[in-house]
Curated annotation (Swiss-Prot):
EC number: 3.2.1.55
Cited SUPFAM superfamilies: AbfB domain (SSF110221), Concanavalin A-like lectins/glucanases (SSF49899)
The keyword Hydrolase is assigned to this record: yes
Record gene name: abf1
Signal peptide: 1-21
Organism: Hypocrea jecorina (Trichoderma reesei)
Glycan attachment points: 467
UniProt name for this protein: Alpha-L-arabinofuranosidase
GO biological process: arabinan catabolic process; L-arabinose metabolic process; pectin catabolic process
Length: 500
């Protein structure tokens, strides 16, 4: 009995050590150490206490670094306090490996980004809230046009050298544009030929390779192709993904590579492809360059969307056993969804009106004139038609029911949506794009009054009245309606019962 007790005790110690180890500790034990480790949600080494990411606030341009708590989970409360009463962007995602492979705002390349001088957008600091073992943290919500990069990375694989990588992603946030990637890319932000990349791709693009079903799929961006297997076409063994939290893994070595994936909240990894390199010129041997990208393609293609929580790149080709242990660690982190809304509650099915709080305009309400969404002066004595135009039925968010959509009271089936960053009233065509354009998340009013209403699909952007017309605006940016002056007031609205 004593012998059995000692065996059980030893097993508990071993299990405790495994729980304490981070993904990069596990990779190191497997002989394939992390050369880049990025996460805004948690430490990826058990002993890491440095910064996870940096945020910059809109009010004064100040920055602060967000570090892990003793649990290893990011100190989201520190971010919330720093960003109170303003907006914040994620400016740096720090590399935890010690190699300095930090990710910053991606520069222009083969494609230019939407920001000044062709840079990509930075992500909102609040677009992707989650909990890890019940503790709040924030992921990186990548809207089209958003991207991060390091073109001078240290220790990453070059040429045909072996490497592995994984990422934890939101399996419900994707599109078919190029290319939501994380991994190894060109160092000049341009397409330099077949085989010059090796990165995780997630989405439902059908331009190059595909898997089974309609997608989304985990594939590899190897440059000039998204590959689901050895063929440039279809691999029926690469399944469509439906998990809310997804673990995606890619690894490659001379004439051998693999795609693996699974549910990041439970269970184990499956192998979707393992075999020879694509039998197309340029992929055997590979010509990897060693830059690191997030949310974009190697040439800065920036039309894709997705959400990133954590990921690493390794030196050497990890064994399946090592990756399986990393997956167990991810599952033990207990990723779960967190509320996307705050502030005054809205009731689905209710009729509401939305009054401006800017000093100029406190008698003006969000209304519509045909398809144009604007502000108009409305009161209880206004004509019935105007009162109907200034009233909105709250619906569960068409793209995400944790947020809301706003249906016109006088034009049934038509909703407020954004189009080219303007707000318009359009009939619901049932498309995925419409649903995303018409989904908005409320939060306590940034100026301290009422509510601010941010776009679910572009969480840096909020309902804003500007010259009496409604836009989704960011707190500073390239558009005239992104002006910082009066931003906090212009994006805060008092919600009350609808006029009709």
């Amino acid at each position: 009995m004593l012998s059995n007790a000692r065996i059980i005790a030893a097993g508990c110690i071993a299990a405790g050590s495994l729980v304490a180890a981070g993904p990069c500790d596990i990779y190191s034990s497997g002989g394939t150490p992390c050369v880049a480790a990025h996460s805004t949600t948690r430490a990826l080494f058990s002993a890491y206490t440095g910064p996870l990411y940096q945020v910059k606030r809109g009010s004064d341009g100040a920055t602060t670094a967000i570090s892990p708590l003793s649990s290893g989970v990011a100190n989201a409360a520190a971010q919330d306090a720093f960003c109170a009463g303003t907006t914040c962007l994620i400016t740096i995602i720090y590399d935890q490996s010690g190699r300095g492979n930090h990710l910053t705002q991606a520069p222009p390349g083969g494609f230019s980004g939407p920001e000044s001088n062709g840079y990509d957008n930075l992500a909102s600091a609040i677009g992707a809230p989650v909990t890890l073992n019940g503790q709040k943290a924030y992921g990186v919500f990548v809207s089209p046009g958003t991207g991060y990069r390091n073109n001078a990375a240290s220790g990453t694989a070059k040429g045909d050298a072996a490497e592995g990588m994984y990422a934890v992603l939101d399996g419900t946030h994707y599109n078919g544009a190029c290319c939501f990637d994380y991994g190894n890319a060109e160092t000049n932000s341009r397409d330099t030929g077949n085989g010059h990349m090796e990165a995780i791709y997630f989405g439902d693009s059908t331009v190059w390779g595909t898997g089974s079903g309609k997608g989304p799929w985990i594939m590899a961006d190897l440059e000039n192709g998204l590959f689901s297997g050895s063929s440039p076409g279809n691999n029926a063994g690469d399944p469509s993904i439906s998990y809310r939290f997804v673990t995606a893994a890619i690894k490659g070595q001379p004439n051998q590579w693999a795609i693996r994936g699974g549910n990041a909240a439970s269970g184990s990894l499956s192998t979707f492809y393992s075999g020879a390199r694509p039998q197309v010129s340029g992929y055997n041997p590979m010509s990897k360059e060693g830059a690191i990208i997030l949310g974009i393609g190697g040439d800065n293609s920036n039309g894709a969307q997705g959400t990133f929580y954590e990921g690493v790149m390794t030196s050497g080709y990890p064994s399946d056993a090592t990756e399986n242990s990393v997956q167990a660690n991810i599952v033990a982190a207990r990723y779960a969804v967190a509320p996307l809304t705050s502030g005054p509650a809205l009731t689905v099915g209710s009729s509401i009106s939305l009054r401006a709080t800017t000093a100029c305009c406190t008698t003006r309400y969000i209304a519509h004139s045909g398809s144009t969404v604007n502000t108009q002066v409305v009161s209880s004595s206004s004509a019935t038609a105007l009162k109907q135009q200034a009233s909105w039925t709250v619906r569960a968010g068409l793209a995400n029911n944790a947020c809301f959509s706003f249906e016109s009271r006088d034009t049934s089936g038509s909703y407020i949506r954004h189009s080219n960053f303007g707000l318009v009233l359009n009939a619901n065509d049932g498309s995925k794009l419409f649903a995303e354009d018409a989904t908005f998340c409320t939060q306590a009013g940034i100026n301290g009054q009422g509510s601010s209403i941010r776009s679910w699909s572009y969480p840096t952007r909020y309902f804003r009245h500007y010259n009496n017309t409604l836009y989704i605006a960011s707190n500073g940016g390239v558009h005239v309606f992104d002006a910082t002056a009066a931003f906090n007031d212009d994006v805060s609205f008092v919600v009350s019962g609808g006029f009709a």
